[in-house]
Protein backbone atom coordinates (compact mmCIF):
# COMPACT_ATOMS: atom_id res chain seq x y z
CA UNK A 1 0.00 0.00 0.00
CA UNK A 2 1.44 3.35 -1.05
CA UNK A 3 0.17 6.65 0.37
CA UNK A 4 0.32 10.17 -1.02
CA UNK A 5 -0.65 13.37 0.78
CA UNK A 6 -1.48 16.50 -1.21
CA UNK A 7 -2.49 19.90 0.24
CA UNK A 8 -4.84 22.47 -1.33
CA UNK A 9 -5.11 26.03 0.04
CA UNK A 10 -4.88 29.71 -0.79
CA UNK A 11 -1.57 30.61 0.81
CA UNK A 12 -2.02 34.39 0.39
CA UNK A 13 -3.48 36.42 3.27
CA UNK A 14 -4.47 40.11 3.36
CA UNK A 15 -3.21 42.47 6.06
CA UNK A 16 -4.63 41.57 9.46
CA UNK A 17 -5.80 38.07 8.50
CA UNK A 18 -4.56 35.11 10.52
CA UNK A 19 -6.69 32.08 9.53
CA UNK A 20 -5.56 29.45 7.04
CA UNK A 21 -7.86 26.70 5.71
CA UNK A 22 -6.42 23.72 3.88
CA UNK A 23 -7.77 20.54 2.33
CA UNK A 24 -5.45 17.55 2.66
CA UNK A 25 -6.12 14.77 0.16
CA UNK A 26 -4.82 11.38 1.28
CA UNK A 27 -4.71 8.59 -1.31
CA UNK A 28 -3.74 4.95 -0.85
CA UNK A 29 -3.13 2.90 -3.98
CA UNK A 30 -2.37 -0.73 -4.72
CA UNK A 31 -1.62 -3.58 -2.36
CA UNK A 32 1.98 -2.42 -2.24
CA UNK A 33 4.60 -4.33 -0.30
CA UNK A 34 3.77 -4.71 3.37
CA UNK A 35 6.47 -6.55 5.28
CA UNK A 36 3.92 -7.80 7.80
CA UNK A 37 0.41 -7.17 6.55
CA UNK A 38 -1.68 -7.53 9.71
CA UNK A 39 -4.24 -10.28 10.03
CA UNK A 40 -7.87 -9.25 9.89
CA UNK A 41 -10.31 -10.09 12.69
CA UNK A 42 -14.01 -9.73 11.89
CA UNK A 43 -16.69 -9.56 14.56
CA UNK A 44 -20.39 -9.90 13.72
CA UNK A 45 -22.69 -8.42 16.40
CA UNK A 46 -26.40 -9.26 16.13
CA UNK A 47 -29.40 -7.87 17.98
CA UNK A 48 -31.71 -10.77 18.86
CA UNK A 49 -34.16 -8.80 21.04
CA UNK A 50 -37.86 -9.62 20.92
CA UNK A 51 -38.60 -7.11 18.17
CA UNK A 52 -36.35 -9.09 15.81
CA UNK A 53 -38.80 -12.00 15.73
CA UNK A 54 -40.10 -13.24 12.42
CA UNK A 55 -38.85 -12.00 9.05
CA UNK A 56 -36.14 -9.76 10.50
CA UNK A 57 -34.59 -12.60 12.50
CA UNK A 58 -34.61 -14.99 9.59
CA UNK A 59 -33.11 -12.37 7.27
CA UNK A 60 -30.44 -11.50 9.85
CA UNK A 61 -29.45 -15.13 10.29
CA UNK A 62 -29.33 -15.66 6.53
CA UNK A 63 -27.26 -12.51 5.95
CA UNK A 64 -24.88 -13.41 8.77
CA UNK A 65 -24.32 -16.90 7.39
CA UNK A 66 -23.57 -15.38 3.97
CA UNK A 67 -21.23 -12.82 5.55
CA UNK A 68 -19.31 -15.60 7.27
CA UNK A 69 -18.77 -17.24 3.87
CA UNK A 70 -17.10 -14.06 2.58
CA UNK A 71 -14.51 -13.76 5.36
CA UNK A 72 -11.04 -14.36 3.95
CA UNK A 73 -9.44 -17.68 5.00
CA UNK A 74 -6.44 -15.73 6.30
CA UNK A 75 -8.64 -13.88 8.81
CA UNK A 76 -10.14 -14.77 12.16
CA UNK A 77 -13.76 -14.11 13.10
CA UNK A 78 -16.32 -14.34 15.88
CA UNK A 79 -20.07 -13.86 16.32
CA UNK A 80 -21.88 -12.18 19.22
CA UNK A 81 -25.63 -12.03 19.84
CA UNK A 82 -27.29 -9.73 22.35
CA UNK A 83 -30.60 -8.65 23.81
CA UNK A 84 -30.59 -7.64 27.47
CA UNK A 85 -27.84 -10.26 27.81
CA UNK A 86 -24.93 -11.14 25.54
CA UNK A 87 -23.92 -14.50 24.07
CA UNK A 88 -20.73 -15.65 22.41
CA UNK A 89 -22.25 -17.49 19.46
CA UNK A 90 -18.88 -18.32 17.90
CA UNK A 91 -15.56 -17.75 19.67
CA UNK A 92 -12.63 -16.14 17.80
CA UNK A 93 -11.25 -18.71 15.37
CA UNK A 94 -9.46 -18.92 12.01
CA UNK A 95 -11.85 -18.62 9.07
CA UNK A 96 -11.46 -22.23 7.94
CA UNK A 97 -14.33 -24.01 6.18
CA UNK A 98 -14.92 -26.14 9.30
CA UNK A 99 -15.02 -23.16 11.67
CA UNK A 100 -17.27 -21.24 9.30
CA UNK A 101 -19.71 -24.17 9.13
CA UNK A 102 -19.81 -24.47 12.93
CA UNK A 103 -20.48 -20.74 13.29
CA UNK A 104 -23.18 -20.78 10.62
CA UNK A 105 -24.94 -23.65 12.39
CA UNK A 106 -24.79 -21.77 15.70
CA UNK A 107 -26.23 -18.65 14.05
CA UNK A 108 -29.09 -20.65 12.59
CA UNK A 109 -30.07 -21.81 16.09
CA UNK A 110 -30.50 -18.25 17.42
CA UNK A 111 -33.95 -17.20 18.66
CA UNK A 112 -35.23 -13.69 19.35
CA UNK A 113 -36.34 -12.48 22.77
CA UNK A 114 -35.65 -9.86 25.44
CA UNK A 115 -34.69 -6.19 25.42
CA UNK A 116 -31.85 -4.16 23.88
CA UNK A 117 -28.70 -3.41 25.90
CA UNK A 118 -25.95 -2.41 23.50
CA UNK A 119 -23.16 -1.69 25.99
CA UNK A 120 -22.84 -5.38 26.88
CA UNK A 121 -22.41 -6.31 23.23
CA UNK A 122 -19.72 -3.67 22.74
CA UNK A 123 -17.92 -4.81 25.89
CA UNK A 124 -17.92 -8.42 24.69
CA UNK A 125 -16.64 -7.38 21.25
CA UNK A 126 -13.83 -5.36 22.82
CA UNK A 127 -12.89 -8.36 24.97
CA UNK A 128 -12.71 -10.62 21.92
CA UNK A 129 -10.66 -8.17 19.85
CA UNK A 130 -8.20 -7.54 22.66
CA UNK A 131 -7.32 -11.24 22.66
CA UNK A 132 -5.84 -10.72 19.18
CA UNK A 133 -3.63 -7.61 19.34
CA UNK A 134 -1.89 -6.21 16.29
CA UNK A 135 -4.64 -7.24 13.88
CA UNK A 136 -7.08 -5.20 11.79
CA UNK A 137 -10.15 -5.22 14.02
CA UNK A 138 -13.50 -4.76 12.27
CA UNK A 139 -17.06 -5.23 13.54
CA UNK A 140 -20.41 -5.20 11.76
CA UNK A 141 -23.24 -4.32 14.15
CA UNK A 142 -26.95 -4.88 13.49
CA UNK A 143 -29.91 -3.69 15.56
CA UNK A 144 -33.60 -2.98 15.04
CA UNK A 145 -34.50 -1.14 18.22
CA UNK A 146 -33.72 1.63 20.67
CA UNK A 147 -31.12 1.03 23.32
CA UNK A 148 -32.45 0.69 26.87
CA UNK A 149 -32.55 4.18 28.38
CA UNK A 150 -30.81 2.94 31.53
CA UNK A 151 -27.91 1.72 29.39
CA UNK A 152 -27.01 5.03 27.72
CA UNK A 153 -24.39 6.13 30.25
CA UNK A 154 -22.85 2.66 30.26
CA UNK A 155 -22.77 2.69 26.46
CA UNK A 156 -21.00 6.06 26.42
CA UNK A 157 -18.36 4.72 28.81
CA UNK A 158 -17.95 1.50 26.86
CA UNK A 159 -17.56 3.28 23.52
CA UNK A 160 -14.77 5.37 25.04
CA UNK A 161 -13.04 2.11 25.99
CA UNK A 162 -13.63 0.65 22.51
CA UNK A 163 -12.18 3.67 20.70
CA UNK A 164 -8.97 2.65 18.98
CA UNK A 165 -9.58 -1.06 19.64
CA UNK A 166 -11.86 -1.75 16.67
CA UNK A 167 -13.79 -0.04 13.90
CA UNK A 168 -17.50 -0.67 13.60
CA UNK A 169 -20.04 -0.28 10.81
CA UNK A 170 -23.60 0.00 12.14
CA UNK A 171 -26.80 -1.07 10.46
CA UNK A 172 -30.36 -0.44 11.58
CA UNK A 173 -33.09 -2.67 10.15
CA UNK A 174 -36.61 -1.29 9.96
CA UNK A 175 -37.49 2.11 11.44
CA UNK A 176 -37.92 1.52 15.18
CA UNK A 177 -34.35 2.47 16.13
CA UNK A 178 -32.85 5.93 16.63
CA UNK A 179 -30.48 7.40 14.07
CA UNK A 180 -28.58 9.40 16.71
CA UNK A 181 -27.78 6.22 18.67
CA UNK A 182 -26.34 4.48 15.62
CA UNK A 183 -24.41 7.59 14.61
CA UNK A 184 -22.98 7.83 18.12
CA UNK A 185 -21.49 4.33 17.83
CA UNK A 186 -20.30 4.69 14.24
CA UNK A 187 -18.68 8.09 14.80
CA UNK A 188 -16.81 6.97 17.90
CA UNK A 189 -15.59 3.79 16.21
CA UNK A 190 -14.73 5.29 12.80
CA UNK A 191 -17.46 3.40 10.98
CA UNK A 192 -20.59 4.06 8.95
CA UNK A 193 -24.25 4.15 9.99
CA UNK A 194 -26.89 3.12 7.47
CA UNK A 195 -30.48 2.00 7.33
CA UNK A 196 -31.64 -1.35 5.97
CA UNK A 197 -35.28 -0.49 5.37
CA UNK A 198 -36.33 -3.98 4.31
CA UNK A 199 -34.98 -7.27 5.71
CA UNK A 200 -34.61 -8.55 2.14
CA UNK A 201 -31.82 -5.99 1.57
CA UNK A 202 -29.74 -7.26 4.48
CA UNK A 203 -27.70 -9.87 2.60
CA UNK A 204 -26.49 -7.39 -0.05
CA UNK A 205 -25.58 -4.82 2.61
CA UNK A 206 -23.65 -7.34 4.71
CA UNK A 207 -21.87 -8.60 1.60
CA UNK A 208 -20.70 -5.09 0.65
CA UNK A 209 -19.57 -4.32 4.20
CA UNK A 210 -17.53 -7.51 4.57
CA UNK A 211 -15.96 -7.17 1.12
CA UNK A 212 -14.93 -3.61 1.96
CA UNK A 213 -13.44 -4.73 5.28
CA UNK A 214 -11.49 -7.53 3.60
CA UNK A 215 -9.95 -4.97 1.23
CA UNK A 216 -8.20 -3.08 4.03
CA UNK A 217 -4.45 -3.59 4.24
CA UNK A 218 -3.08 -1.00 6.68
CA UNK A 219 -4.45 -0.35 10.16
CA UNK A 220 -4.23 2.48 12.69
CA UNK A 221 -3.24 5.11 10.13
CA UNK A 222 -2.86 8.58 11.63
CA UNK A 223 -2.88 12.07 10.19
CA UNK A 224 -0.03 13.86 11.99
CA UNK A 225 -0.03 17.65 12.13
CA UNK A 226 3.03 19.56 13.35
CA UNK A 227 2.67 23.30 13.90
CA UNK A 228 5.26 25.89 14.92
CA UNK A 229 4.71 27.88 18.10
CA UNK A 230 3.37 30.71 15.94
CA UNK A 231 0.39 28.59 14.83
CA UNK A 232 -2.35 26.48 16.38
CA UNK A 233 -4.85 24.01 15.01
CA UNK A 234 -8.45 25.23 15.16
CA UNK A 235 -10.18 22.18 13.71
CA UNK A 236 -9.63 18.94 11.82
CA UNK A 237 -12.42 17.10 10.00
CA UNK A 238 -12.65 14.32 7.47
CA UNK A 239 -14.76 15.73 4.63
CA UNK A 240 -14.87 12.87 2.11
CA UNK A 241 -16.33 10.32 1.68
CA UNK A 242 -18.31 11.63 4.65
CA UNK A 243 -17.96 14.28 7.33
CA UNK A 244 -16.30 13.04 10.53
CA UNK A 245 -15.33 15.46 13.30
CA UNK A 246 -11.79 14.68 14.50
CA UNK A 247 -10.83 17.88 16.32
CA UNK A 248 -11.36 16.57 19.84
CA UNK A 249 -9.75 13.20 19.08
CA UNK A 250 -6.21 14.52 18.70
CA UNK A 251 -3.50 12.59 20.56
CA UNK A 252 -0.35 14.58 21.43
CA UNK A 253 2.89 13.18 20.02
CA UNK A 254 5.06 15.96 21.41
CA UNK A 255 4.64 19.62 22.32
CA UNK A 256 3.94 20.64 18.71
CA UNK A 257 2.59 17.49 17.01
CA UNK A 258 -0.82 15.81 17.20
CA UNK A 259 -2.10 12.57 15.67
CA UNK A 260 -5.67 12.31 14.38
CA UNK A 261 -7.12 8.79 13.91
CA UNK A 262 -8.16 7.70 10.42
CA UNK A 263 -8.50 3.96 11.03
CA UNK A 264 -7.72 1.20 8.53
CA UNK A 265 -7.22 1.77 4.81
CA UNK A 266 -7.67 -0.11 1.58
CA UNK A 267 -7.15 1.38 -1.88
CA UNK A 268 -9.07 4.65 -1.49
CA UNK A 269 -8.86 8.42 -1.20
CA UNK A 270 -10.14 10.73 1.53
CA UNK A 271 -10.15 14.50 2.08
CA UNK A 272 -9.52 16.33 5.35
CA UNK A 273 -10.23 19.98 6.18
CA UNK A 274 -7.79 21.55 8.65
CA UNK A 275 -8.02 25.14 9.90
CA UNK A 276 -5.12 27.00 11.55
CA UNK A 277 -4.73 30.28 13.40
CA UNK A 278 -1.42 32.09 12.90
CA UNK A 279 0.28 34.98 14.61
CA UNK A 280 -0.60 37.90 12.35
CA UNK A 281 2.30 38.85 10.08
CA UNK A 282 3.26 41.99 8.22
CA UNK A 283 2.91 42.51 4.47
CA UNK A 284 5.64 40.48 2.79
CA UNK A 285 6.05 38.03 5.69
CA UNK A 286 5.97 34.28 5.13
CA UNK A 287 5.00 31.92 7.93
CA UNK A 288 4.91 28.14 8.16
CA UNK A 289 1.44 27.00 9.22
CA UNK A 290 1.87 23.23 9.34
CA UNK A 291 3.80 20.15 8.30
CA UNK A 292 1.33 17.33 7.65
CA UNK A 293 2.11 13.63 7.34
CA UNK A 294 0.46 10.23 7.21
CA UNK A 295 1.92 7.81 9.75
CA UNK A 296 1.51 4.04 10.22
CA UNK A 297 3.48 0.97 11.30
CA UNK A 298 5.10 -1.58 8.99
CA UNK A 299 7.23 -4.42 10.36
CA UNK A 300 7.40 -2.64 13.69
CA UNK A 301 8.81 0.52 12.12
CA UNK A 302 7.05 3.86 11.78
CA UNK A 303 6.38 4.86 8.18
CA UNK A 304 5.86 8.57 7.56
CA UNK A 305 4.69 10.15 4.29
CA UNK A 306 4.93 13.93 4.37
CA UNK A 307 3.10 16.60 2.39
CA UNK A 308 4.71 19.80 1.12
CA UNK A 309 4.77 22.37 3.95
CA UNK A 310 1.77 24.66 4.31
CA UNK A 311 3.09 28.24 4.16
CA UNK A 312 1.14 31.51 4.40
CA UNK A 313 2.25 34.80 2.83
CA UNK A 314 0.82 38.25 3.61
CA UNK A 315 0.35 40.46 0.57
CA UNK A 316 -1.45 43.62 -0.55
CA UNK A 317 -2.28 42.03 -3.92
CA UNK A 318 -6.06 41.61 -3.81
CA UNK A 319 -6.04 39.38 -6.88
CA UNK A 320 -4.18 36.84 -4.74
CA UNK A 321 -5.90 37.31 -1.38
CA UNK A 322 -9.43 37.32 -2.81
CA UNK A 323 -9.12 33.83 -4.26
CA UNK A 324 -11.17 31.17 -2.53
CA UNK A 325 -9.51 27.80 -3.02
CA UNK A 326 -11.88 25.56 -4.95
CA UNK A 327 -11.33 22.57 -2.65
CA UNK A 328 -11.92 24.58 0.52
CA UNK A 329 -14.99 26.27 -0.96
CA UNK A 330 -16.47 22.94 -2.06
CA UNK A 331 -16.21 21.30 1.34
CA UNK A 332 -17.40 24.40 3.16
CA UNK A 333 -20.52 24.06 1.01
CA UNK A 334 -20.84 20.34 1.78
CA UNK A 335 -20.69 21.08 5.50
CA UNK A 336 -23.38 23.74 5.08
CA UNK A 337 -25.46 21.21 3.14
CA UNK A 338 -25.25 18.67 5.97
CA UNK A 339 -26.22 21.32 8.53
CA UNK A 340 -29.18 22.49 6.43
CA UNK A 341 -30.56 18.94 6.23
CA UNK A 342 -30.22 18.42 9.97
CA UNK A 343 -31.87 21.77 10.73
CA UNK A 344 -34.66 21.04 8.26
CA UNK A 345 -35.43 17.61 9.68
CA UNK A 346 -35.36 18.94 13.25
CA UNK A 347 -37.74 21.77 12.31
CA UNK A 348 -40.07 19.32 10.57
CA UNK A 349 -40.12 17.07 13.64
CA UNK A 350 -41.06 20.07 15.81
CA UNK A 351 -43.87 21.05 13.44
CA UNK A 352 -42.16 24.24 12.21
CA UNK A 353 -42.94 23.66 8.56
CA UNK A 354 -41.85 27.11 7.36
CA UNK A 355 -38.35 26.64 8.77
CA UNK A 356 -38.22 23.06 7.51
CA UNK A 357 -39.11 24.23 4.00
CA UNK A 358 -36.49 26.98 4.10
CA UNK A 359 -33.67 24.75 5.35
CA UNK A 360 -34.46 21.82 3.06
CA UNK A 361 -34.79 24.23 0.13
CA UNK A 362 -31.32 25.55 0.90
CA UNK A 363 -30.11 21.94 1.04
CA UNK A 364 -31.60 21.18 -2.37
CA UNK A 365 -29.86 24.22 -3.86
CA UNK A 366 -26.47 23.31 -2.33
CA UNK A 367 -26.76 19.67 -3.35
CA UNK A 368 -27.52 20.63 -6.95
CA UNK A 369 -24.74 23.22 -7.14
CA UNK A 370 -22.14 20.79 -5.81
CA UNK A 371 -23.24 17.82 -7.90
CA UNK A 372 -24.19 15.77 -4.84
CA UNK A 373 -26.70 13.65 -6.72
CA UNK A 374 -26.98 11.08 -3.93
CA UNK A 375 -28.19 13.73 -1.48
CA UNK A 376 -30.53 15.22 -4.09
CA UNK A 377 -32.07 11.76 -4.54
CA UNK A 378 -32.59 11.40 -0.79
CA UNK A 379 -34.05 14.90 -0.50
CA UNK A 380 -36.53 14.22 -3.30
CA UNK A 381 -38.17 11.53 -1.15
CA UNK A 382 -38.87 14.04 1.62
CA UNK A 383 -39.65 17.18 -0.42
CA UNK A 384 -40.89 18.00 -3.90
CA UNK A 385 -38.06 19.95 -5.53
CA UNK A 386 -39.79 22.70 -7.53
CA UNK A 387 -36.69 24.69 -8.54
CA UNK A 388 -33.37 23.37 -7.28
CA UNK A 389 -31.40 26.35 -8.59
CA UNK A 390 -33.55 28.71 -6.52
CA UNK A 391 -33.88 26.37 -3.55
CA UNK A 392 -37.65 26.15 -3.93
CA UNK A 393 -39.22 23.02 -2.44
CA UNK A 394 -42.53 21.79 -1.03
CA UNK A 395 -42.69 19.45 1.94
CA UNK A 396 -44.36 16.17 1.04
CA UNK A 397 -47.56 15.61 3.00
CA UNK A 398 -46.69 11.96 3.62
CA UNK A 399 -43.11 10.76 4.03
CA UNK A 400 -41.93 7.20 4.47
CA UNK A 401 -40.16 7.02 7.83
CA UNK A 402 -37.33 4.99 6.28
CA UNK A 403 -36.71 7.70 3.67
CA UNK A 404 -36.52 10.37 6.38
CA UNK A 405 -34.05 8.27 8.39
CA UNK A 406 -31.99 7.60 5.26
CA UNK A 407 -31.76 11.35 4.59
CA UNK A 408 -30.74 11.95 8.21
CA UNK A 409 -27.98 9.33 8.12
CA UNK A 410 -26.88 10.28 4.61
CA UNK A 411 -26.56 14.00 5.34
CA UNK A 412 -22.88 13.59 6.27
CA UNK A 413 -21.95 11.89 2.97
CA UNK A 414 -20.33 14.33 0.61
CA UNK A 415 -19.71 14.69 -3.10
CA UNK A 416 -16.02 14.67 -3.98
CA UNK A 417 -14.42 17.96 -4.97
CA UNK A 418 -12.86 18.24 -8.42
CA UNK A 419 -9.10 17.75 -8.26
CA UNK A 420 -6.79 20.73 -8.75
CA UNK A 421 -3.04 20.35 -9.28
CA UNK A 422 -1.69 23.22 -7.17
CA UNK A 423 -2.05 24.95 -3.79
CA UNK A 424 -3.57 28.17 -5.06
CA UNK A 425 -6.16 26.93 -7.55
Residues covered by each model-derived region:
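Exposed acidic/Ser/Thr-rich ligand/metal-binding surfaces
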Residues: 4-220, 279-282
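Acidic, polar loop-rich interaction surfaces within structured domains
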Residues: 158-167, 179-297
